[in-house]
Amino acid sequence: MGMLAVKYQIGLHVDCCLGGFVLPFAKKLNYKIPDFDFSVPGVSSMSLDTHKYGYALKGTSVVLYAFKELRQSQYFCYADWTGGECA
């Protein structure tokens, strides 16, 4: 898929929400895990749920971007959220 993303100059998002925090350690233990991260040409973003195996609070997640230009489009402010301001 990474080769297609490069060929057609489109973004490739990798959903690592389940296992994203475990897979790098499994690779270090010599499990045969295919490359899935920014080492794959064409991968432009990844998501990880920190509340699953990252031991963070329920509902927290992380989005990682390969390029700053992609990240700049992500920011928003929503003041009517019941938990307060979210930015």
What is each model feature region?
Residues 1-26, 41:
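Catalytic PLP-binding core of fold-type I/II PLP enzymes
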